[in-house]
Amino acid sequence: MWYRTFRTLGYTICRPYATCATKAERFVKTIDPSTLPRGYLVSSTYAGIKNAIRPVTSTNEPSAATTNVPHPQEAPKPDVALIVSSVPAAIAGTFTTNVFKAAPVVHATTALKAAGPNARVRAILTNSGCANAVTGQQGLEDTQTLVNRVQALLSPRNQNAIPTYEQDARSSSTDVLMMSTGVIGVRLPVAHIQRCLEHLAAPSILQSHPDAWLEAARAYMTTDTFPKIRTRQFILGNRRCSIVGIDKGAGMIHPRMTRSGGQLHATLLGVFATDAPISSATLQRCLDEAVRVSFNCISVDGDMSTNDTILALANGQAPFVDLDCTDTPNEWTETEHPDMVNKFAEELKSLCIEMSHLIVRDGEGAEKFVQVHVRNAGTYEQAHAIASSISTSALVKCAMHGEDANWGRILCSAGYASLPASTPAWTLDPSKVNVTFLPPPHQPDDLAPLPTLVNGVPQAVNETQAKKLLSYEDIYVDVDLQGGSWGSQGRSEATYWTCDFSKEYITVRW
Amino acid sequence: MWYRTFRTLGYTICRPYATCATKAERFVKTIDPSTLPRGYLVSSTYAGIKNAIRPVTSTNEPSAATTNVPHPQEAPKPDVALIVSSVPAAIAGTFTTNVFKAAPVVHATTALKAAGPNARVRAILTNSGCANAVTGQQGLEDTQTLVNRVQALLSPRNQNAIPTYEQDARSSSTDVLMMSTGVIGVRLPVAHIQRCLEHLAAPSILQSHPDAWLEAARAYMTTDTFPKIRTRQFILGNRRCSIVGIDKGAGMIHPRMTRSGGQLHATLLGVFATDAPISSATLQRCLDEAVRVSFNCISVDGDMSTNDTILALANGQAPFVDLDCTDTPNEWTETEHPDMVNKFAEELKSLCIEMSHLIVRDGEGAEKFVQVHVRNAGTYEQAHAIASSISTSALVKCAMHGEDANWGRILCSAGYASLPASTPAWTLDPSKVNVTFLPPPHQPDDLAPLPTLVNGVPQAVNETQAKKLLSYEDIYVDVDLQGGSWGSQGRSEATYWTCDFSKEYITVRW
């Protein structure tokens, strides 16, 4: 089977990266079919989007159209995926705050707003290759055309519709959403995608098998070097609940057209589908919190996309553990089932963090995975701002690439962070700052933490230990502000994840 | 003479950079002695600071101490410079807003605050090689020790003091300031610097010759590839006024010790000395405005240093044009001499802009000089925030390096700029944005502007023209927001200057 052709090497976090296998070999894991959520079917195919679109140019080089055609004997990577819930699912979403929102983002946010707290969706259509961004009114119409077509195909009036579909009074016309990633400023090749939709929505094509999920994850990929998919399973009350997460990392979509005319674009897309019975409003709050400490805490190059979207679906199809007792309520809400919701929120958060790390690990040119933990700040927002400033500093990222325990650059970037206001005002106290490099968990060398700055005073550094610590692929930086101007009242912390800046990044991003 | 050994090639801005001479050959210009301000003397020498300091390590490699010793036949670059005014000069300063301010920054800001609006200085002592940052109370004491020593040497009670010195009742004990740049977290080698001071302050060593000024500019350099010095001369009323500016660009100070232990650091230092008669308070306002639109509008790598300092001195020694009419007031102030002050402010601003550009051109690994002009925003601060966001985007900087007219990345980075609030609120309107690449001034190819986005709609791009425009060393990006949500009321503009991101940057910053 395709997904088994990746060797799962049992990646050891503390092995020096230079000796490791490819990222695909290390980070693609076999999916246990029993951990996939119930009531979802997926399909994906190759629509030829990259070849269909041309950048807006006045000259067309003859070779441009054929550049991305794969070798005849090589199956092209799928670029369209459909995820269908057998019943209308509760839906939640978080979207880019970029002013220039792509058409699918505008469509989804408008649809969710119109649908209100009981919003339901039946399907998520995703394409890679074209972001449908900066495409104006035409872009919105293109998204709507495709969404309408999927809705019609999944409608119970369509005699070919998937048999498990159940009519639900709550479902509305907003029940298909779309996500796009790829080249911006170019119209979506609607005809190319449209002619795949009947195939994608056919009952014989929609599958619940791990192969189908992995292929869907591949359809999301742009310059990602591996498909990103993980599952979680847990017992909640009398239900065995599962979540599957797919995401894709920041990546250049048009590697052969990087010169003028090719509009490269990086986007974060993610979808989390669960069979837990959660209301839309509750799911939204769980997702907000999960994204706040996962996807909103990663950085590859500091550039926020026009298309960033994370969607979560909950269809309530989780099986009962004790079949004699099936009187679980239809949907859990925070007020009525706080324990269930809290446990679900923790599981979703944990999965979001794991999935966000995969994006950092697959960051363009990334050779290091760096965790920046800022402790004992005034507020979470202040700790987050400082961790973000450190994690996006080009100088820090170059130092990590060079395996240099450079506390000076860390301190400097912490010092110019733009701090959100708080009452009372909170400030960093230079004489209280500790910067320590921590050994990665489970490292075999039994290294001790390496303090480089204690109470604002530079420390004598054991060069041998520093060299060893920084040679790991995973670097853990601990910044303890000891409460700053609030003293013992300053106890907030935030964790950020970033990668290093390598020459490879410049090459990829030319 | 040393400064004439650089060929001044009459740099043509539109020549493709690949065919150009070195940056030193292109950007070091001969100084006309008659354009230097009156009443200033300078000296510089090699104190061996880089060799004197050792990073805080537990192991000392034998080779470390000798790494930076120059070839015996090669004169070492000076690393200490003294600029002395023959009379106490009005003083103004702008300093880094980084929380972790270096000792000389704390010393200077404290001294200027204590001295009040009539602050006067006699001398500026500058060293490169050691930033005296993150050195705590000891660092402050070290700065004070050196400042005290220079004061004693320049005191009229010292019989060797320079003969032109005139006692001034207004001068106070705060009349020597210091600037430092280099390695951080390491104590200043006070003894090494101190033993040079008598030499530096000796009347036979202090000079007003262009050679002496150029050597002082060299003393400021860290990884700068050329000394940065320019002059301005202009008639104000009955006075022929001059300004000389020296600055140094962001640079790694310890290229041989970039691995753990070496704490690399980038700093912007600048000094502007004029013989115009300007009061300290007025000089401060002129400097604030000049820095706001020059040094605060450049970016090399987006990292703000702990040592950034710009100082301005005005000693009132400008010669009279008409010697029969010498009744000019002692000092010009904004309220009493607005025309004089406005003209002076324009000259200072123009010089600051020129000097700030030299830093961008000498940016580490920089091969392109990029001007980002944002027009028709709500407020200056909003235009500045958008221009800054575009100029610090790694993706935009990579695109400029790759000579890619990538309006998508420009738009995207404009879209996530963190906008300062205004009343009423102002927002970007995606349907009004124009992005145009402009031909550099005086380019011989007579190229037309290249609109890539008009009213938010991507334009067909003439590939040949785009290729030509982007092949220039200087790239001009014009972003017209057409007033955004304020319509015709949105008329503010800001200009930012940045460089590209090259593989060379990663190499330098390892």
Curated annotation (Swiss-Prot), chains A, B:
Active site: 267
One family name in Pfam for this protein: ArgJ
Post-translational modification: The alpha and beta chains are autoproteolytically processed from a single precursor protein within the mitochondrion.
Compartments, as annotated in UniProt: Mitochondrion matrix
Catalysed reactions listed for this entry: N(2)-acetyl-L-ornithine + L-glutamate = N-acetyl-L-glutamate + L-ornithine; L-glutamate + acetyl-CoA = N-acetyl-L-glutamate + CoA + H(+)
Region of interest (Disordered), ranges: 57-76
CDD domains named in the record: OAT
Pathway where it operates: Amino-acid biosynthesis; L-arginine biosynthesis; L-ornithine and N-acetyl-L-glutamate from L-glutamate and N(2)-acetyl-L-ornithine (cyclic): step 1/1; Amino-acid biosynthesis; L-arginine biosynthesis; N(2)-acetyl-L-ornithine from L-glutamate: step 1/4
Keyword flag Transferase: yes
Keywords: Acyltransferase, Amino-acid biosynthesis, Arginine biosynthesis, Autocatalytic cleavage, Mitochondrion, Multifunctional enzyme, Transferase
Gene Ontology terms: biological process: L-arginine biosynthetic process; ornithine biosynthetic process
Molecular function (Gene Ontology), one example: L-glutamate N-acetyltransferase activity
Parts forming coiled coils: none
Regions of compositional bias (Polar residues) in chain numbering: 57-70
InterPro entries referenced in this protein's UniProt entry, alphabetically: Arg_biosynth_ArgJ (IPR002813), ArgJ-like_dom_sf (IPR016117), ArgJ_beta_C (IPR042195)
Site residues, Cleavage: 266-267
PANTHER family xrefs: ARGININE BIOSYNTHESIS BIFUNCTIONAL PROTEIN ARGJ (PTHR23100), ARGININE BIOSYNTHESIS BIFUNCTIONAL PROTEIN ARGJ, MITOCHONDRIAL (PTHR23100:SF0)
Note: This protein may be expected to contain an N-terminal transit peptide but none has been predicted.
Family per similarity comment: Belongs to the ArgJ family.
Function: Catalyzes two activities which are involved in the cyclic version of arginine biosynthesis: the synthesis of acetylglutamate from glutamate and acetyl-CoA, and of ornithine by transacetylation between acetylornithine and glutamate.
Record's protein name: Arginine biosynthesis bifunctional protein ArgJ, mitochondrial
